[in-house]
């Protein structure tokens, strides 16, 4: 039998003592007092920060929003069905952040940047805070490049620039989402990254939008962030900030981005729900006092960066739904005051068959012609005024029986101008095609045609120019000016095509 040697034992003990690493792990913990309706009240968590992420025993993550003297109010990022009274909670020391990378392009994700399209995980090496400060005054420059939407009514009269914030507002079922999705479709080949944020929408509506993008080949430069109507209020509240963080990632990498929020009024409702459950005092329409700040800090992140930061841009297009045309409600007035203009969609126009149903009279872009190419300014300068005069005259003509010839001519011209602004959904037009269309109407070439023939003729004219006179498109795209040569081509082609069209219609 072997005897134990004392020196060996002492050596082993000495080695073990040397290897001992004294690590003290301090964790800030608390206990659940109450849980329900997506809100948990926690006792403890004395050193938690406002907006800090906390983790519950069973894995649910929450955000500490209310820091009170005797408890902490936490909103849950999940259903929290497994959280029990008395279970422990620990502070993570982190503020809400998401991974970001080029790999997100073409994917559908949720507010936590997790994929929900069933196409596997998304690899990312960097991360960004969901809430980051907006660029300062010195970091920006004024908006000067156009963001073409492909819709004649917008690009000619209510132009949107890269880095602008333009509100799309109107009643339900007036084509607001269609205007936004057409804008995304028109960015194909324009080197613009698009982010579409669906907040509190029907899952079927989001699926329809994604299908449209896939069919038109727009998903390759688009990210869809979706939190549908059945998502927890916390995630609906976070979704727009997640979209903004992804768009910012590309903006600071010297790229142009466009982000659509559909729609911030649903985000405000989710925030109202959270605030009321946290027992914050309600204000107008029961919204909390800081609901303006909710939207202003989101929309202020849209910017056109200066040359030292790489001239990237982020254009925001929030969509707000009104109730029976009431733009004086709380959320619409808030968002109107934050944005640089609004596109107003009218249900009366929509029902009258004028689509997109844009009310040109009360829609405005506060950036104006700075966001247009020179060619468009030259051709469309008087279009808005002519349409406004026509609308006034049309209202007057309803009561007058006998009108003089000049008034009749002006009414006929106005009807044809209104007709050329009509467009089918998912059929955006290139800026060269828009210039041809507006020039044809504004210079009276459409006057011999019946109103019902206008659309058919314009399609024919644009096709003819594209195939037989490609030099017109080259002049506009290279110089961005409506030159005498470009006008000469149109003066030669349009009368010929009108004659040919009228002959075809007679036979």
Curated annotation (Swiss-Prot):
Presence of the UniProt keyword Nucleotide-binding in the record: yes
Residues holding ATP: 170-177
Catalytic activity: ATP + H2O + 4 H(+)(in) = ADP + phosphate + 5 H(+)(out)
Listed GO MF terms: ADP binding; ATP binding; proton-transporting ATP synthase activity, rotational mechanism
Main localization category: plastid
Residues of the site described as Required for activity: 363
Known partners and oligomeric status: F-type ATPases have 2 components, CF(1) - the catalytic core - and CF(0) - the membrane proton channel. CF(1) has five subunits: alpha(3), beta(3), gamma(1), delta(1), epsilon(1). CF(0) has four main subunits: a, b, b' and c.
Family: Belongs to the ATPase alpha/beta chains family.
Protein name in UniProt: ATP synthase subunit alpha, chloroplastic
């Amino acid at each position: 039998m072997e005897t134990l040697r004392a020196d060996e034992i002492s050596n082993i003990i000495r080695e073990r003592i040397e290897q001992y690493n004294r690590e003290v792990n301090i964790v800030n913990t608390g206990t659940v007092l109450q849980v329900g309706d997506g809100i948990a009240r926690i006792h403890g968590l004395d050193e938690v920060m406002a907006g800090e992420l906390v983790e519950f025993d069973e894995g649910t993550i929450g955000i500490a929003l209310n820091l009170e003297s005797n408890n902490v109010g936490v909103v849950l990022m999940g259903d929290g069905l497994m959280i029990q009274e008395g279970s422990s909670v620990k502070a993570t020391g982190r503020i809400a952040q998401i991974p970001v990378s080029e790999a997100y392009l073409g994917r559908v994700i949720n507010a936590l940047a997790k994929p929900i399209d069933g196409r596997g995980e998304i690899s990312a090496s960097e991360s960004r805070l969901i809430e980051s400060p907006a660029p300062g005054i010195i970091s920006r420059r004024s908006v000067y490049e156009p963001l073409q939407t492909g819709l004649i009514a917008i690009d000619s009269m209510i132009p949107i620039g890269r880095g602008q914030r333009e509100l799309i507002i109107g009643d339900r079922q007036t084509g607001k989402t269609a205007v936004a999705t057409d804008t995304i479709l028109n960015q194909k080949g324009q080197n613009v990254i698009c982010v579409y944020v669906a907040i509190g929408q029907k899952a079927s509506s989001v699926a329809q939008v994604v299908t449209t993008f896939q069919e038109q080949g727009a998903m390759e430069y688009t990210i869809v962030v979706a939190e549908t109507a059945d998502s927890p209020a916390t995630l609906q509240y976070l979704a727009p900030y997640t979209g903004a963080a992804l768009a910012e990632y590309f903006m600071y990498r010297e790229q142009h981005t466009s982000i659509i929020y559909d729609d911030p009024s649903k985000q405000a409702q989710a925030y109202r729900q959270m605030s009321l459950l946290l027992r914050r005092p309600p204000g107008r329409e029961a919204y909390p006092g800081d609901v303006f700040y909710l939207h202003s800090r989101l929309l202020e992140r849209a910017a056109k960066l200066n040359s030292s930061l790489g001239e990237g841009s982020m254009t925001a297009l929030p969509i707000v739904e009104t109730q029976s045309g009431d733009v004086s409600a709380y959320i619409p007035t808030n968002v109107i005051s934050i944005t640089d203009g609004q596109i107003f969609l009218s249900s009366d126009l929509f029902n009258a068959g004028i689509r997109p149903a844009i009310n040109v009279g009360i829609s405005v872009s506060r950036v104006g012609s700075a966001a247009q190419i020179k060619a468009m300014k030259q051709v469309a300068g008087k279009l808005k005024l002519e349409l406004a005069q026509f609308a006034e005259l049309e209202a007057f003509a309803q009561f007058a029986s006998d009108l003089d010839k000049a008034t009749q001519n002006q009414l006929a011209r106005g009807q044809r101008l209104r007709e050329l602004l009509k467009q089918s959904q998912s059929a955006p037009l290139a800026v060269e095609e828009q210039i041809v269309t507006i020039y044809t109407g504004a210079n009276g070439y459409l006057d011999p045609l019946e109103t019902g023939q206008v659309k058919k003729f314009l399609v024919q004219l644009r096709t003819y120019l594209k195939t037989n006179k490609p030099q017109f498109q080259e002049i506009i795209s290279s110089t961005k000016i409506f030159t005498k040569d470009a006008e000469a081509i149109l003066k030669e082609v349009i009368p010929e095509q009108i004659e040919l069209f009228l002959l075809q219609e007679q036979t």
